[in-house]
Structure formats: structure tokens, C-alpha cells
């Protein structure tokens, strides 16, 4: 019988993993990918026939490689998809601990030893049970003096003599989380638990939300097991400053002609606002803001999958970036709340 909660029996290593430092896509939609990521709001760093390199505001990197690049591990699924996730760590001590933890795993590899010791340029990698290359290196993300717009909930006035912003487009702050379909949920959860990931919430036997440290955002990784046995990338989420930037980014992508999968909307489980688009690099891509922040006092909850659990509210098909209404709704000169 499969253990429904494998991580409960595995000690969580107190490792200093900071979050996602880089991801690598492989695609055969090369020029479309370049245009998409520019519209998405990433900063271009390099563009060669073999690789595109982009970054977020805090320096997290997005690499795009050719779909037949021999340096990449085999894909989890056909077509454009994610081939590698790089996690940033605090220091050499963390890398040494991870090297010991991963040394028995399939595909274990250490690059760039310095004087036979692990240093700042070292990459430690292995394949997770689904075959995704998981890499650890010292974090190169930058600290930022950014703040989202405060809100004025009842009884707690935080924004005075200042209007909320209206964004013309988004400029993602960081790579927030990755989500994969798996047919090995128990194995995958146990693998990441040994690396220090902590379970935040779960769909028993169906899915698990995990964060890379006890204190941090609701999840850095979500693993979802479907009845169909589908394997591969679901989506990558990019964190923006606030709900207003979710709207501004989504409306800009709409004006650029990109297709919404779902959104905007709000997830009850993490409290985050979202907007999902179809991505020529593979899977879906999400603007994400205002997720819950957890500590080691948090107790993981259990949910049964369902539409009201996934979304408190959501707009199917998005919002037209020109009319600011759902695409099938004609514009007029009246107020949206005007009686008809």
C-alpha cells in the first residue's frame, strides 16, 4: 500500500535553500518564445542561435534552449517543456549537505570543483523520480527595495493620500513556483522532503504543495497526480508586486495577442491572485501575487480537489486588454454598473 503521507516519516533537513534561481525550457517555437518572454516582462541578457537568456528583477534566470539540445536530459513529455530547475542556496555548507544527500540519486553530478572542494561556482545536480534535472548552486538573486501597493482593509488603513497604481505591463520580480504532473506522487514528495522541502497543504493521494524552507511563501513546488497518469509541466509562476500588476500584466499580454488559459482569479488555498497564459516555451505561465506567508508553526491542511478549492473566483478566457471586459462582451459608453 502506498503511504499517503511519506514525508511524515522523513526528517526534514534544515538546509538553506532560498528558492528558484533559474529554469531551463526547451522549445521548437524559437522566435515565438523570444517575443512572448519580452512581452511577459523579462529582461534579455543574451541571444545566440543555441540559447536565449532572460532574467527577472531579482536576477532569477530563464534559459531557453533548442528542443533537440543534446546537453539537456530527456524530456518528461513530448514538445516544448521545462527540462531543468535550479534552486539557489545560501552557502557552501548547504551545497556540501546537498551533495551528500543527492550522491546516491540517479543522474548525480557535480560540476566545477575548486581545489577539490565545493565553492561558489559549483553546480550539484541529480534527476528527480520523474526524470527532471534538479540543480543546486549558490544563489545569485539580488535583494530589491521593492514594495507592492498597500491596501486599506477595514480597521487597518495603510494607504493614505496615495492612489493604488495602474500598471501598463508587468515586470516579474522573481520565479515563484513550478507545478508538475506526476504519476509518482509518493516518490516525488519523499525525494523533495529529503532535500528539506516542507509540505504546506495536500490533496490526499492527488497532490502536494511544498515549500523549500519552513518560513516562506505557501509553495515553491506543487506536484499533482491525475487519474489519467499524465506526466509533465503544468505551469511556472512568476511573482509580481501586487494584484494591480497581475491585472496590468495580463491586460498587456492580451493586447499583445497572447491567449489566456484562465484568469484573472484567486486561489483560496494560497490566497494568491493569478492569471494564466499559454506559453510557447511549454505548459502554462502565471502572474502571481499576494500569497500566504508560512512559518514552522503552520499545520498542513487536507483538501478534496474541486473547482471551488482551486479558485474562489476566476474569469474563463481572460479580459480583453483593449475593452477591459471579457472578450465576448461588447464595449459601450456606459458605466459597467449601469442598469440594463
Regions found by a protein language model. Give the residues of each.
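Vicinal oxygen chelate
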Residues: 1-13, 18-28, 60, 74-171, 208-209, ...
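Conserved short beta-strand elements that form part of the metal-binding/catalytic scaffold
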Residues: 2-3, 42-80, 132-140, 200-232, ...
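Core segments of cupin and vicinal oxygen chelate
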Residues: 15-61, 125, 179-218
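Conserved active-site tyrosine of GNAT-family acetyltransferases
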Residues: 33-38, 131, 188-192, 253, ...
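Residues at alpha-helix termini
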Residues: 39, 104-105, 194, 255
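Ordered, small/hydrophobic-rich secondary-structure cores
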Residues: 53-116
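Solvent-exposed alpha-helices and their adjacent loops that cap or buttress functional pockets
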Residues: 171-172, 215
